[in-house]
């Protein structure tokens, strides 16, 4: 296997914008976690090579807890890139690059909640299809 870098896509980091946690009942071992991840893309005005992924993540077992999180990932495209490659970067690569940071945040947060949830390690997510594009304001 050959491993290389992708010089045309730069990841500039993730910011956690909002976290809402609600404990409903004492945690038990029979927790059945449901994860919903909804990424959207935003292209800032007058910055042709910049895009952002807004990711809403819900993790819950409605019997015990609900965790809602919103994060934003910052990305930059370098050079002349064909439209099909740009589309793949935006719709597949960027959310896949960003998600492990969000996942890690959730694990760290729940580890520090004590016995409220136990430490949650949510499964990896796979991204396919076109992201909803948020309007430029």
Language model features by range: what are they?
Residues 1-97, 104-137:
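N-terminal intrinsically disordered, cationic/polar leader segments
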């Amino acid at each position: 296997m050959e491993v290389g870098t992708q010089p045309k896509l730069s990841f500039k980091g993730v910011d956690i914008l909002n976290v809402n946690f609600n404990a409903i009942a004492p945690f038990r071992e029979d927790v059945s976690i449901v994860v919903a991840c909804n990424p959207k893309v935003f292209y800032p005005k007058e910055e042709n090579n910049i895009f952002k992924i807004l990711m809403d993540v819900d993790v819950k077992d409605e019997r015990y807890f609900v965790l809602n999180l919103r994060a934003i990932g910052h990305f930059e495209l370098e050079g002349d890139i064909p439209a099909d490659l740009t589309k793949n970067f935006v719709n597949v690569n960027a959310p896949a690059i960003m998600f492990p940071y969000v996942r890690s945040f959730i694990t760290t947060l729940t580890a520090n909640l004590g016995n409220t949830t136990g430490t949650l390690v949510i499964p990896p997510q796979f991204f396919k299809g076109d992201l909803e594009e948020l309007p430029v304001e």
